[in-house]
């Protein structure tokens, strides 16, 4: 019972905080009384590139399932999304056991954005010398997130994600970010199951800009690049290496007060320097086409958020 009480109190500020009296500012518009539903068709995946520089060997493992549907729901500063991959969306669906599932959770608190991500995929393939090899028993599970801070109060970070805000005038901002991810690699090659674990932590500066092309159209682009450290646990021992990471993101969106749509993409690259000659590149990518609609949230939700605002002086 005590854990649930702490959990509810943790979420209260995120549910209540926002521009409750001023829905429209000079630079962006908010929808504090809206329940935002967003769905998308997404090409996504987490591929891995292994490079042996000393022996000039390179091969890439790509997930068998890469296309999936994703749905998210946002109210005020909370956003929850999940995605799944039906077999008919993927050309290699005849390979039993392959799967792709992901969940995303975001909290917006003032200038801060906290993200949590879960990505589980099973079944990979590799192309070597024109021949495709399948590894249905190779799977990865990635858990982690990032903490970002928006320096410029005129810039709307929410316009890029859940579309619970909309940029009215062009603005950009430096957005430094701290990230941490755990990845488990699992393979069964017929001689028992082998597992490998990595933990990545990094920090770096970023910059994002929202171009208002028209009152209903916006183009956004940005990049974050940083350094960190990666810990590799292979069972007998744990070693650490330098980590270099960079992320590119771009979105073109259309918006009305109720309906919105757009196309967006993101590419994240992690390079693990596992010694002088060995490299493990971890690539996370997606391209999505999304549509969404804003409903009026239940009056009880808005009333509860208003009471919390008044109680804690957040109005």
Task: Give the label of every model feature segment.
Residues 44-68, 79, 83-94:
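Surface-exposed strand-loop-strand hairpins of Gram-negative outer-membrane beta-barrel proteins
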Residues 37-45, 73, 82-86, 107, ...:
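Transmembrane beta-barrel strands of outer-membrane/channel proteins
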Residues 31-37, 67, 76-78, 110-114, ...:
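Outer-envelope beta-barrel architecture signal
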Residues 20-26, 77, 109-111, 147-167, ...:
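Outer-membrane beta-barrel proteins
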Residues 39, 69-75, 103-109, 145-151, ...:
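Residues on the lipid-exposed face of transmembrane beta-strands in outer-membrane beta-barrel proteins
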Residues 102, 251-315:
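Predominantly the C-terminal beta-signal and adjacent terminal strand-loop region
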């Amino acid at each position: 019972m005590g854990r649930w009480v702490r959990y509810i109190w943790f979420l209260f500020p995120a549910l209540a905080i926002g521009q409750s009296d001023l829905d429209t500012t000079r630079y962006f518009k908010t929808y504090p009384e809206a329940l935002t539903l967003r769905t998308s068709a997404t090409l996504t995946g987490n591929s891995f590139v292994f490079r042996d520089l000393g022996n000039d060997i390179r091969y890439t493992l790509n997930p068998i399932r890469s296309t999936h549907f994703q749905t998210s729901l946002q109210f005020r500063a909370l956003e929850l999304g999940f995605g799944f991959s039906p077999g008919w969306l993927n050309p290699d669906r005849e390979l039993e056991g392959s799967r792709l599932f992901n969940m995303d959770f975001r909290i917006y608190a003032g200038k801060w954005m906290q993200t949590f991500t879960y990505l589980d995929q099973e079944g990979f393939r590799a192309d070597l010398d024109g021949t495709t090899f399948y590894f249905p028993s190779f799977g990865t599970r990635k858990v982690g997130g990032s903490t970002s801070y928006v320096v410029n109060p005129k810039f709307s970070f929410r316009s890029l994600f859940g579309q619970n805000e909309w940029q009215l005038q062009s603005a950009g901002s430096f957005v430094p970010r701290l990230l941490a991810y755990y990845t488990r690699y699992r393979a069964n090659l017929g001689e028992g199951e082998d597992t490998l674990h990595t933990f990545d932590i990094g920090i770096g500066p970023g910059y994002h800009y929202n171009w208002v092309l028209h009152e209903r159209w916006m183009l956004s682009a940005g990049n974050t690049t940083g350094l960190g450290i990666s810990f590799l646990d292979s069972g007998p021992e744990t070693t650490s290496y330098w980590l270099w990471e960079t992320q590119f993101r771009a979105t073109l969106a259309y918006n009305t007060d109720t309906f919105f749509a757009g196309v967006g993409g993101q590419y994240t690259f992690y390079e693990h320097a596992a010694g002088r000659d060995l490299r493990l590149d971890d690539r996370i990518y997606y391209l999505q086409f999304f549509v969404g609609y804003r409903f009026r949230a239940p009056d009880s939700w808005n009333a509860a958020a208003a009471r919390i605002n008044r109680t804690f002086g957040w109005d």
